[in-house]
Amino acid sequence: MNKKLFSLAAALVLCTTMTAQKPWDNGKLKVSENQRFLQFENGKPFFWLGETPWLMPERLNRDEVAFYLKRCHDAGFNVAQIQVINGVPAYNIYGVPSHDKQGRLLTSGAYSYWDHLDYIIDTAAQNGIYVGMVCIWGGLVKGGKMNIEQAKTYGTFLANRYKNRPNIIWFMGGDVPGDVKPEVYEALANTIKSIDKNHIMTYHPRGRYTSAKWWSKAKWLDFHTFQSGHRKYNQRMGNKDYPIPDNTEEDNWMYVDSTWAYKPIKPVLDAEPSYEEIPIGLHDNKLGYWKACDVRRYAYWSVFGGSCGHTYGHNAIMQFYREGYGPAYHCKKTWTEALYDPGFNQMKYLKHLMLSFPFFERVADQSVVLDNGKQYERLAATRGNDYLLIYNYTSRDMKIDLRKISGDKKKVWWMNAGTGELTWLGEYDNKVLTFRPHKEGAGIEDGVLIAIDSSKSYLSKDQHQIDTPVGGPAIDLTE
C-alpha cells in the first residue's frame, strides 16, 4: 500500500471514529466480583480481544498506525499489546531514540520517540482500543539494561505521562520468567501503581507458563496471563525443565485450571498462543505453519475453559514485516497482506458470542459432554444457568446432557466459527442427545453448538449471524 493510500486511510479514521462511543465511557476497567472476569465500573462486561502489534512503536509511521488500528477496530479487537521499548535506546521509524547515549529518557525535540507513542495511544483511543503497554521487554531486564533505581525513574515517567489516558493496560514482563530479576519488576510495577490509580496491570510470562507461578500474591497484579506458546503436541524440543505434562503443548485450556490453583483467584487469559502463519514450533518451518483453524481452536478452547478473553497474533503483524526488513520466523507475507487473512478477521465472532449471553455466571463445565475425546477430539464446554456452548474442532458427533441448564425444552443452533453464521437445528426435549453438525462426508467445519432454555430469547430462530443479536439482555457489543 502506497503512502497516499495510507494518508487517505488515516484521514478516514478521524472521520469515522471520533464521534463513536468508547468503551471507557462505561468507566474504568476492574475485576468482577467473582474474580474471574473483567468489567467496567458501571457493571458492563469487558471481553478482552487482543492483538499483538509488538513492534508498532518502532516500525510504523503515523499514517500506518492510523491504518492498522482502524483495521483492528473493524475486526473487533479492543486491545493492542505493544513493546514500549525493545532496546535501550529503542529507535522508531523516524530514527528517533527513546534514550540518549547516557541511557536517560529523551523527550526533547520536535517529535520525540515518546511523542510518537502518544500518537499511537491516542489513535488507538479514537478506535476504542486499549493499549497493552509492556513497559520494557523482558530480555532487556534479563540483560541488565534496567536496575531497581532505573525502574523507579522509568515507572515514574510512564505513570505521570499516561495515567490520565483512558485506554492504558500495564504489562510487566515480556516473554521472560518471573524469577529473572523480580526485584526490578517489583520496583517498576509498584512505582507505576503508586502514581496511576486508573489502570489495571498484569505480567506477560515465558512460553508454557502462567504469571501465577511467580506473582499470585502480588498486590500490583490485577489479572493473570499465560503464554501457551507456539509448539505442537509432543514438541518438547529437549527442554529438561518442563512446566507442563508431556504431549499437552496445544492444550491451552489447561492453563486456566493451573492458574486458578494459585490463590487468590484472579481473571486469566492466553496473552500469546500460536500465531497465524508462524511456523509450528516457531523456529523451523519444516512442519508447516499454524493456520486460521488453529488460532480459532486456541481461542475457543481457552475462553470455554474459563478465560476472561483471548489474544490473537499473526507472524507478519507482530513484526510488521515489509520489504527492507529481514523476515523473522520464516515470515512469508507483508503485514498489510496479513490484515486480510482469515484468522485476523474471525476472532470477532467469539467476542460477539460471549457477549450475547449472561456474562458473569458463565463457567467451564466438561460434565455436559458424555463422550469426550482427547487433543483435537476434545469438546470444550461452557455454560451459564440457561445456556450451553460447546466448541467442536473436528465436527465429530457430540453426546450432550441438555439437563445441565434450565428449561424443559432447549433451542439449539450451530455456529460456524469461521464465519459467525448460525444454523437453526430445532427445539429438543430436556435429555441426553447426540448431535452431529454435518451429514456424513460433508467435511470438517469447526464451530459451536449453542443450546438455550426455550423460554429465553438470547438468539432468534431467524438470526443468521452471531454478530447481529436479537432480543436477550441489553449488552453493548462495541467494546
Label each region the model flagged.
Residues 44, 264-268, 275-278, 291-426, ...:
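Aromatic- and carboxylate-lined catalytic core of secreted/periplasmic carbohydrate-active enzymes
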